[in-house]
From Swiss-Prot:
Pfam families: 14-3-3. GO terms for cellular component: cytoplasm. It comes from Oncorhynchus mykiss (Rainbow trout). Adapter protein implicated in the regulation of a large spectrum of both general and specialized signaling pathways. Binds to a large number of partners, usually by recognition of a phosphoserine or phosphothreonine motif. Binding generally results in the modulation of the activity of the binding partner. This is 14-3-3 protein beta/alpha-1. Induction: Repressed under stress conditions such as netting. It is found in: Cytoplasm. Belongs to the 14-3-3 family. Homodimer, and heterodimer with other family members. It comes from the Eukaryota. The record marks R56, R127 as: Interaction with phosphoserine on interacting protein. The modification N-acetylmethionine is found at M1.
Length: 244
């Protein structure tokens, strides 16, 4: 199918909230090679974020049920098997995205902004894999996630404004990685606070087009900081970290 037709199909699928179809169309666009436009890049990201997000949410629900069925072997086995089925789907989706990133997207990115966007995405999808991994595979996915985030972070600090929504979104997700995956609340808070403070200091550089996106992510950074600080002081907090 022609690239423009595939993009149109992805937009239709998004309107219909059929994200698996949307992801398949944008995967086909990516596999045609060449650099994606900003619109195509965002369509790809939204599609897979919804596809993987549904499985992450399902996995959490079933994991919680599985823990609550201790003592009832039959129910626990059913829950475990269902969790493993969801886990396999989630892993396949992440591996699909990571293959697109490694084989096409990162290599074809010519602008710093695109490179940061895709490296952040790589960090995100290794983070999703690490959420369901254990043992050696967890260690590998965590290392790969941190490496991708760090590379993106270094480029963003060098080549992007502190108020740029992609730089802010990266700081948000990298700080969530420190908090949830590495269990390093101090580092998470330090990273989130620095990103927030740097953006506040340069509010006059806020681009009109991205004003809404940037301020929304700044709000999420601040919400996470409030939550994490209260949790570290021993208050009961809801661990629903905002991420981008």
């Amino acid at each position: 199918m022609d690239k423009n037709d595939l993009v149109q199909k992805a937009k239709l699928a998004e309107q219909a909230e059929r994200y698996d179809d949307m992801a398949a169309a944008m995967k086909a666009v990516t596999e045609q090679g060449g650099e994606l436009s900003n619109e195509e890049r965002n369509l790809l990201s939204v599609a897979y974020k919804n596809v993987v997000g549904a499985r992450r949410s399902s996995w959490r629900v079933i994991s919680s049920i599985e823990q609550k069925t201790e003592g009832n072997e039959k129910k626990q086995q059913m829950a475990r098997e269902y969790r493993e089925k969801i886990e396999a789907e989630l892993q396949d989706i992440c591996k699909d995205v990571l293959a697109l990133l490694d084989n096409y997207l990162i290599a074809n990115a010519t602008q710093a902004e695109s490179k940061v966007f895709y490296l952040k995405m790589k960090g995100d999808y290794y983070r999703y894999l690490s959420e369901v991994a254990s043992g050696d595979s967890k260690k590998t996915t965590v290392e790969n996630s941190q490496q991708a985030y760090q590379e993106a972070f270094d480029i963003s600090k060098k080549d992007m404004q502190p108020t740029h929504p992609i730089r802010l979104g990266l700081a948000l997700n990298f700080s969530v990685f420190y908090y949830e995956i590495l269990n390093s609340p101090e580092q998470a808070c330090s990273l989130a606070k620095a990103a927030f403070d740097e953006a506040i200091a340069e509010l006059d550089t806020l681009n009109e087009d991205s004003y809404k996106d940037s301020t929304l992510i700044m709000q999420l950074l601040r919400d996470n900081l409030t939550l994490w600080t209260s949790e570290n002081q021993g208050d009961e907090g809801d661990a629903g970290e905002g991420e981008n």
